Swiss-Prot record:
The active site is at H124 (proton donor). Signal peptide: none annotated. Its cofactor is Mn(2+). Pfam families: Metallophos, STPPase_N. Belongs to the PPP phosphatase family. PP-1 subfamily. This is Serine/threonine-protein phosphatase PP1-1. Essential role in cell cycle control. PP1 is perhaps required for exit from mitosis. Its EC number is 3.1.3.16.
Amino acid sequence: MSNPDVDLDSIIDRLLEVRGSRPGRQVQLSEDEIRFLCNKAREIFISQPILLELEAPLKICGDIHGQYYDLLRLFEYGGFPPEANYLFLGDYVDRGKQSLEVICLLLAYKIKYPENFFILRGNHECASINRIYGFYDECKRRYNIKLWKTFTDCFNCLPIAAIIDEKIFTMHGGLSPDLNSMDQIQRIMRPTDVPDTGLLCDLLWSDPDKDLTGWGDNDRGVSFTFGPDVVSRFLHKHDMDLVCRAHQVVEDGYEFFSKRQLVTLFSAPNYCGEFDNAGAMMSVDESLLCSFQILKPAEKKQRYGYQGSSQNWHMTPPRKNKTGNSK
């Protein structure tokens, strides 16, 4: 599938050339280049597990939703690959104006640094969803529908979840009442669409609810909500310390749940231009100390550049200490 005429470094350079430009400036890759990114990345996704087992240190990012200049701000702040290892939790496309640049840069980095750069599937990496919420229209306007279908083939092979040093369980959405053993995730065959119910659906769609005990209906009309007791039981059963997920806008870019046993990350500040939220990235160091780097919502007249602040939390104990979370 590799195309000798496509220059990966040139693609990355052009995607990064707009750093410092006024947000909104587009990067128009050729159709052949995008097809190469989709096909080559798809090969790599299939060659790696659907349930990734990763090692710290790494940086974890939540939803991006087509906000390309905010993605560049995240890399400015955390270090452009290969300066740091990254794990993204899905929802790269839809809603924002530059889904194509976002997904092309992420796929290019995946191809360039396959063992250091990881992206999971979100509920928007699914044809029935991104057909409606913007990505299809962006592909059709800037290229053609055939290219959108090429992206769909790639998205259908994305990994679903990742475990960091056996202690941090990450996915886009949340837990599932059907999840008893990690083997169940490993047995999911790719390529696959996202079904309307069941384990894969829940991992991409479910949400925590602090006021709930057990499982409840989800206002989204898909999957479930789950209470703090579900999180505690899950972590105890699997000898883990933390669930890290995305999928919901949170005001500060990150938000704890269930006595810091779960954290929600959202990395698109000023989401859709309608929210005043910050975006956050979580850094996990070798001892599994988690810290947060915050992209503050930009003021209306502010041009490109990150406003950042860092906050550290002893969220998980060192690897060999299994006495529970530090405060």
